[in-house]
């Protein structure tokens, strides 16, 4: 097959961009060396092959250990069958598959319109986002959880609600943060899906308690209440409301009353905006807002947790294709989320510049929660939603026949037709023979890493005395 000049130019551009992205992701950000996946593998290996508890395991020479709910360890049991390098390969493939599904849900129709070139450029740009590249290089599970949650959004929006809630339930059993999506299902008046999510999460938790009773008892009575096991609240990678208050109060403890007030305000804004989105049938917008609220409300939101911002970015870029100002805003936010800017205040987040700069991703998340364009169903609804709901119903047999307009007496489209884009024009399109045109976190770490390579960890905590 011969390539046209345009195709050759596009191919060269993609190859150059992919090379630059590969070099950047391999050298500029400090390599995380699959650290979190090493924790998962080591904890499961210690449990299965050495009879220990997953919560007693520590990476040799560190205080880093397993911090997820017990079902997360049960779901990772297959790791015990592999060596570390095979487990890394499997984890990489899972993250790639999750990323492909997330892209399909968020931008599948647009990517199909732009073909291989649009897909290649999108993948390269996605790989530059700090939350995405950190999820891959740490061997984290965030993209898999996002895929599970968006899978439920897809089921609800395509009339396959029978299994909706399973993904959210599994995600909540693996990590607590996605449980907020169960509340969204209640706001959406989807009690069956919410019940399914609760049932799946409860069943998974009971299964884990049966498989590992001692570890489950320890987690639910002690570990779940101890945030110091996860990391220091004031560490710069913690881009949550709690992180802002902790850095502001450092070295004192952050005010619980201040956090409660801020959390209530965020909850109020989230409920208000999510209900507006749902009222307009904007399912993707409601799920995007919920991901933003989850990042803000969680006690600890490491930078790699911010993959929950991907639905919001997809909406912003999609709306930006119609409103240039939003496209500029989306581009600026994208650059900031690629920049690792918060690490400039790694050693000292004091002063006004520290308050503003070290919390950059928090301000982005807050701004999106307040200003994300939702409630505009025809624009923000996912493509698979538009196909199932925007198709005009077939005319009733009893419907009166439409009288074509006389060429000398053109009819004006109704206001409803103008609003919906279904104004009736001449019956035949003569441009192409009558054919119409197509419509266009798993561990605490040392308080101060001793070297730049140790800064690679996304989260730190005071080591046990």
Region spans (language model):
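Primarily membrane-embedded glycan-assembly and transfer machineries that use lipid-linked glycans
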Residues: 1-163, 188-306, 353, 380-389, ...
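Active-site catalytic microenvironments for nucleophilic, acid-base chemistry
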Residues: 81, 185, 314-315, 319
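Hydrophobic transmembrane alpha-helices
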Residues: 83, 98, 175-178, 182, ...
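Transmembrane helices and adjacent periplasmic/lumenal helix-loop junctions
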Residues: 168-185, 297-305
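Hydrophobic/aromatic-rich transmembrane helices and adjacent perimembrane loops
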Residues: 303-318
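Aromatic-enriched
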Residues: 317-397, 465
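Low-acidity, Ser/Thr- and Arg-rich intrinsically disordered low-complexity segments
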Residues: 396, 401-402, 406-408, 413-420, ...
């Amino acid at each position: 097959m011969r390539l046209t000049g345009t195709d050759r130019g596009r191919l060269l551009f993609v190859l150059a961009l992919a090379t630059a992205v590969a070099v950047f992701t391999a050298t500029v950000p400090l390599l995380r060396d699959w650290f979190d996946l090493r924790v998962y593998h080591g904890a499961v290996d210690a449990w299965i092959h050495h009879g220990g508890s997953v919560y007693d395991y520590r990476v040799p020479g560190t205080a880093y250990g397993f911090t997820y709910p017990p079902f997360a360890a049960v779901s990772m049991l297959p790791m015990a069958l592999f060596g570390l390098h095979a487990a890394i390969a499997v984890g990489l493939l899972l993250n790639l598959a999750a990323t492909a599904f997330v892209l399909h849900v968020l931008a599948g129709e647009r990517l199909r319109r732009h073909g291989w070139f649009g897909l290649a450029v999108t993948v390269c740009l996605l790989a530059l986002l700090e939350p995405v590249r950190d999820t891959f290089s740490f061997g984290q599970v965030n993209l898999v959880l996002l895929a599970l949650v968006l899978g439920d959004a897809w089921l609800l929006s395509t009339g396959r609600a029978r299994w909706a809630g399973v993904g959210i339930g599994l995600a909540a059993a693996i990590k607590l943060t996605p449980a907020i999506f169960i509340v969204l299902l209640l706001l959406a008046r989807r009690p069956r899906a919410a019940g399914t999510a609760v049932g799946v999460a409860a069943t998974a938790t009971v299964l884990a308690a049966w498989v590992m009773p001692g570890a489950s008892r320890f987690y639910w009575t002690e570990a779940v209440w101890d945030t110091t096991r996860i990391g220091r609240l004031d560490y710069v990678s913690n881009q949550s409301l709690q992180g802002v208050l902790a850095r502001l109060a450092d070295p004192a403890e952050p005010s619980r009353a201040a956090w409660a007030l801020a959390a209530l305000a965020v909850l109020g804004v989230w409920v208000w905006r999510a209900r507006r989105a749902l009222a307009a049938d904007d399912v993707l917008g409601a799920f995007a807002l919920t991901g933003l609220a989850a990042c803000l409300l969680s006690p600890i939101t490491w930078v790699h947790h911010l993959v929950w911002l991907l639905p919001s970015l997809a909406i912003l870029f999609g709306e930006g294709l119609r409103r240039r100002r939003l496209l500029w805003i989306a581009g600026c936010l994208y650059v900031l989320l690629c920049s690792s800017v918060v690490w400039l205040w790694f050693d000292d987040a004091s002063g006004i510049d520290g308050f503003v700069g070290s919390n950059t991703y928090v301000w982005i998340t807050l701004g999106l929660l307040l200003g994300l364009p939702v409630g505009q169903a025809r624009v923000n609804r996912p493509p698979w939603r538009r196909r199932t709901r925007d198709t005009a119903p077939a005319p009733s047999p009893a419907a009166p026949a439409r009288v074509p307009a006389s060429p000398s007496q053109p009819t004006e489209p109704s206001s409803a037709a103008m609003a919906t884009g279904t104004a009736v024009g001449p019956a035949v399109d003569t441009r192409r023979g009558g054919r119409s045109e197509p419509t266009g976190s798993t561990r605490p770490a040392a308080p101060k890493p001793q070297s730049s390579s140790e800064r690679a960890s996304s989260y730190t905590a005071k080591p046990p005395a």
